[in-house]
């Protein structure tokens, strides 16, 4: 029985990344897959879906099944919103996580917020705009004292620097 659950959990972790149909995810959960299962890096289905899957419906199905929106992976202490801000090309994923109660200004182990991660790494400016629209702290600093605007300058994100300055960032 344990081997069967382990197999279901692996399928759920994979489906979180690739599924485009909610019924696929719901079927695995109905069979007994653990919504809190972790892969070898400590990532849960909600974290993987936030990072790699642009299907908001899959994300919502995981949330409805009880996924922990605030849980952070063990190495970098990044949660689902951090992971989405870092790599997702979908502002709808960001909006869905925020609507579900994700902490907009939560920090990872370096003190980076979702906005810092998006400004530094995500080429999709609509993701950054979604975080700003939601009220992300434009003057947040990581634990070394680097600000959002400094990250934007270092990443050569001229448009973002201009937008942040217009909003009063320093």
Name each model-derived stretch.
Residues 1-31, 39-43, 47, 64, ...:
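Intrinsically disordered, low-complexity regulatory segments in ankyrin-centric signaling systems
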Residues 72-78, 82-91, 95, 109-110, ...:
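Alpha-helical adaptor scaffolds
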Residues 21-29, 53-64, 89-98, 123-132, ...:
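Ankyrin repeat structural motif
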Residues 5-14, 38-45, 72-80, 107-113, ...:
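Ankyrin-repeat boundary/"N-cap" motif
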Residues 1-12, 100, 134, 143-144, ...:
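Ankyrin-repeat-protein effector appendages
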Residues 15-20, 48-55, 83-90, 117-124, ...:
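Ankyrin repeat A-helix N-terminal signature
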